């Protein structure tokens, strides 16, 4: 029997916050792996997505949005995004076509040039009419003629098939790094924490979601094939804890129920989820939390 020739290619997706990086990764692998919310800076670490198409395994790195960081956590997130370039065969810069090119995007372009990186441009959100798209295309064509440009819609899937054809064409003969049906190399504990953090981002107002982190403290497989999960929501102030708990614990019950449903849908087995809130002042300056968050 002839052994199948295996090919691999790795791709990192960088860009400003809320430009569509996580949505694109989820679209390509066909699963909701990377959490998505309307709030900026939802992604804090590199999320690895994997898809195997025929003889080619594609490894995708979704990264934190690049912006002007202020605090210790934000600086760590931006460093994490830039570090992904070293692991990738292809660097893709995703640009929101609904917005004009701003100073941060120009800074990203300049840094890529200083690193001698020729990115592939993804002009995202073309499913919505934009008054900026023609100017953006003209600027990129004039100043970055060596780069390819793909107008896409990560949310509708428009032109994503053409993008995949290009990515596949760049694969090199090499053994696959993962099993054929793997979609990520992230631990289930980490994914579960991300699912809960997504619900906190969606369910809490203003700045509070940025002031917390989630850790899966316990993962116990039970005899009936269900899993008991204990998670800690870490906040820096007692007032934040009060908000998350809600009146008579109503808010945390609501958030827990939504998180549990998402976990069951993703993992495919029953989940018993227990959430606890702990106050840890200045947790954002503690590197132990960064290690758990993979940044």
UniProtKB/Swiss-Prot annotation:
Residues 62-65 are annotated as: G3. SUPFAM superfamilies: P-loop containing nucleoside triphosphate hydrolases, Prokaryotic type KH domain (KH-domain type II). InterPro entries: G_ERA_dom, GTP-bd, GTPase_Era-like, KH_dom-like_a/b, KH_dom_type_2, KH_sf_prok-type, P-loop_NTPase, Small_GTP-bd. Residues 152-154 are annotated as: G5. Keywords: Cell inner membrane, Cell membrane, Cytoplasm, GTP-binding, Membrane, Nucleotide-binding, Ribosome biogenesis, RNA-binding, rRNA-binding. One of its GO terms (biological process) is ribosomal small subunit assembly. Residues 15-22 are annotated as: G1. GO terms for cellular component: cytosol; plasma membrane. GTP binds at residues 15-22, 62-66, 124-127. It is found in: Cytoplasm; Cell inner membrane. GO terms for molecular function: GTP binding; GTPase activity; ribosomal small subunit binding; small ribosomal subunit rRNA binding. Coiled coil: none annotated. Disulfide bonds: none annotated. Residues 41-45 are annotated as: G2. It is a peripheral membrane protein. Gene3D superfamilies: 3.30.300.20, P-loop containing nucleotide triphosphate hydrolases. Pfam families: KH_2, MMR_HSR1. Residues 124-127 are annotated as: G4. Belongs to the TRAFAC class TrmE-Era-EngA-EngB-Septin-like GTPase superfamily. Era GTPase family. An essential GTPase that binds both GDP and GTP, with rapid nucleotide exchange. Plays a role in 16S rRNA processing and 30S ribosomal subunit biogenesis and possibly also in cell cycle regulation and energy metabolism. HAMAP family: GTPase_Era. Monomer. This is GTPase Era. It comes from Rickettsia bellii (strain OSU 85-389). The gene is era.
């Amino acid at each position: 029997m002839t052994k199948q020739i295996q090919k691999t290619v790795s791709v990192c997706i960088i860009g400003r916050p809320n430009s569509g990086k996580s949505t694109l990764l989820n679209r390509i692998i066909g699963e909701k792996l990377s959490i998505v919310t309307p709030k900026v800076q939802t992604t804090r670490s590199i999320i690895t997505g994997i898809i195997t198409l025929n003889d080619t395994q594609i490894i995708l790195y979704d990264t934190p949005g690049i912006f002007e960081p202020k605090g210790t956590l934000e600086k760590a997130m931006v460093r994490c995004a830039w570090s992904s370039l070293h692991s990738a065969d292809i660097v893709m810069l995703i640009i929101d076509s609904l917005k004009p090119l701003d100073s941060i995007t120009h800074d990203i372009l300049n840094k890529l040039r200083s690193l001698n990186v020729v990115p592939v441009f993804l002009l995202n959100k073309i499913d919505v009419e934009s008054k900026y798209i023609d100017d953006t295309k003209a600027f990129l064509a004039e100043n970055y003629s060596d780069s390819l440009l793909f107008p896409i819609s990560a949310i509708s899937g428009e032109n994503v098939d053409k993008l995949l054809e290009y990515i596949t064409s760049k694969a090199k003969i090499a053994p696959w790094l993962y099993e054929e049906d793997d979609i990520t190399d992230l631990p289930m504990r980490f994914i579960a924490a991300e699912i809960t953090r997504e619900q906190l981002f969606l369910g809490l107002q203003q700045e509070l979601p940025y002031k917390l982190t989630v850790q899966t403290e316990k993962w116990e497989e039970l005899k009936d094939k269900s899993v008991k999960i204990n998670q800690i929501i870490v906040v820096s102030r007692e007032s934040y804890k009060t908000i998350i708990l809600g009146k008579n614990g109503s808010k945390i019950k609501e958030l827990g129920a939504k998180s549990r449903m998402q976990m069951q849908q993703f993992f495919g087995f029953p989940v018993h989820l227990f959430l606890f809130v702990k106050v840890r002042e200045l947790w954002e300056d503690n590197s132990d939390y960064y290690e758990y968050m993979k940044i």
